[in-house]
Regions:
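Conserved NAD(P)+-binding/catalytic subdomain of aldehyde/semialdehyde dehydrogenases
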Residues: 1-61
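NAD(P)-dependent aldehyde/semialdehyde dehydrogenase
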Residues: 35, 42-160, 167-183
Length: 183
């Protein structure tokens, strides 16, 4: 029998969260959102094209929302995610390389060996070169949704969102004619 290789494009995905809407969620709904996020990322070790690597935060309460989001995710990850031990080395190595080579890093958090969050100062067109796995995420605050244009290109596969209406998102992307984004 012959093997047939099926090539997959090297794609990435991003998510945007409206911080005010996230903070208004009752705890059980916030936990459901976190579980959905977990399923999109950790269940496939962030290897799926639809797994977000960059989380964008929009709103005036970003710091408070981020703290709650990552805390809830960390609590879930600690109890149900069991990656290989190499995860610790890979994530730490990635962080060190980023700290040395990337002057766009504002700060970072290591919540556990499988949850690293690197906060970017601003969005950058070459972000798509930073595909991650095993619970290593980049995040960035954005003031204007049009800034998403900095990270849209043909490699962008999926754009997930919370706290914005589907109608608004469809209109926004149609009007701004961003590159990439299959779904």
């Amino acid at each position: 029998a012959k093997n047939i290789d099926v090539p997959f494009s090297d794609r990435y995905s991003i998510s945007i969260i409206n911080s005010e809407k996230f903070l208004k969620l009752p705890k059980y709904k916030a936990l459901n959102l976190i579980k959905s996020f977990y399923n999109d990322t950790y269940a496939v070790d962030q290897n799926a094209c639809s797994s977000p690597h960059l989380i964008l935060w929009k709103g005036k309460l970003n710091s408070k929302a981020k703290k709650k989001f990552w805390l809830y995710l960390n609590n879930l990850v600690k109890y149900i995610y069991n990656p290989p031990l190499i995860t610790s080395v890979d994530n730490y190595s990635r962080l060190v390389k980023d700290m040395i080579k990337n002057n766009n890093i504002h700060s970072y958090k290591r919540l556990n060996r499988s949850l690293y969050v690197v906060t970017l100062k601003k969005l950058h067109p070459n972000f798509f070169l930073k595909k991650t796995k095993w619970g290593f995420f980049y995040e960035c605050n954005i003031q204007n949704l049009k800034n998403i244009n900095y990270v849209t290109n043909r490699s962008l596969q999926t754009f997930t969102y919370f706290g914005f209406s589907k109608k608004f998102i469809k209109y926004f992307f149609k009007v701004n004619n961003f590159n990439g984004i299959d779904r």
